[in-house]
Amino acid sequence: VFPQVVVTDGFMRRVEQGAAWTLVDPYEVKQVLGIDLPNLWGTEFDEAYEQIEEAVGLGELTLAQTVNARNLFVDILETQVETGLPYIAFKDAINRANPNKHIGIIPSVNLCCESFSVVVPGKLAHSCNLASVNLAQVEDDELPEMCHLAVRLLDNTIDVTTAPIEEARNHNRNLRTIGVGVLGLADYLAKRGLRYQDKRKIRELFKEFSYQCLMGSVLLAKERGSYPAINSSEYGMGNILGKSRSQRSEWKALYDLFDFYGIRNSHVMAIAPNTSSSLIQGCTASVLPPYAKFNAESLGKGDVMKAVPFLREYGDNYQENQRLEQRIVVDAIAEMQKWVDTGISMELVFNLNPDVYAPNKTVDASDIYDTALRAWRRGLKAIYYIRTVKEDRLSEVDGCGDSC
């Protein structure tokens, strides 16, 4: 079992303020007040929660406890640091980007925190249809072809695969959710002498990646038709990634086709961890910096030596996650997230050894708290694992790998 905690902006604002938060039983809330709390987000959730807190004050709800929101969030982070779990999902950021609000909400994320869409109990169950473009082996002028090919491959996969339950089959048929991701970003940056601090370059790369994946889905709609549930969706109202044509004039060619043909897939991009598949493809995993340029990883009966793929040619250009301030990682992922319609599997690595990030500097609990808060403020949708390094050893609890 890999639990996750789903939090709203309302809760996170109280975390910032150090204000009180009332814990309640959603079942009792529904029975007494008729409020289906798990299916609310944003303003509706905030208004409902005020009503719930009033009911608690009047004694109408008996299963309730008031705690300090900041202390509760710190407890969650402490548990995640110690065990690797629970994952943290930011419900409002996820649902603001949901193109299918007319059908329902996105209640949670998948096991690796990157793939999710509308779930309707008894009717629709999310399924992961994922593939990744290897940026370590793709030149910039090849990116459009690779993105279009990945979209086509995944759309074909929906038609040739039979999901194990009817709810998932309905989801595939009506929403045609896919997730094109990338791996080897650290290699891509190292080969070009770029850093994770180069936010403009990262923004430009993922804007192009997003454009080409969306174009691939629009071209498939021209060939095969839009996804069946497009009417009344964000796409049905003429918006791409929540923006209208007038708000994104530089994408004129895409909107010209989209306005006429629609889009084939209701979700198009999702960036998975790719921990195992990156080993097979000879690149770094996903979009994160490598833990180290060269290190031993314990697998089964012994240690396996790992090195970054281009150690000889570009070794000096690689940044090691074990020595990189995690606010830099959060800011880089935030630039990518602007252009990725679903999620990005982001883990945080905090080195607890002294003098790693700066002379006389040692990471403490406040640094981890500030980084998690920064992730929410920058609009990230989830935090996967939080890992810690002590005496050059990485403590971790592994789960998903490439199974999701």
Annotated model-derived regions:
Residues 80-172, 177, 182-192, 283-285, ...:
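Function-dense linear segments that define catalytic or interfacial modules
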Residues 27-28, 147-169, 194-274, 344-345:
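Internal maturation/activation junctions in enzymes
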Residues 1-140, 163, 167, 213, ...:
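Active-site cavity-forming subdomains of large catalytic enzyme subunits
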Residues 2, 63-67, 77, 100-103, ...:
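Alpha-helix capping and helix-loop boundary segments enriched in small/acidic/polar residues
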Residues 27-35, 90-102, 167-179, 203-207, ...:
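A glycine-rich phosphate-binding loop feature that marks nucleotide/adenosyl-phosphate handling sites
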Residues 116, 154, 158-159, 244, ...:
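Catalytic alpha/beta core of large soluble enzyme barrels
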Residues 1-16, 199-205, 212, 288-303:
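Catalytic or ion-translocation cores adjacent to nucleophile or general acid/base/metal-coordination motifs
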Residues 15-19, 53, 76-81, 134-137, ...:
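Structural signal for hydrophobic packing residues in well-ordered secondary-structure cores
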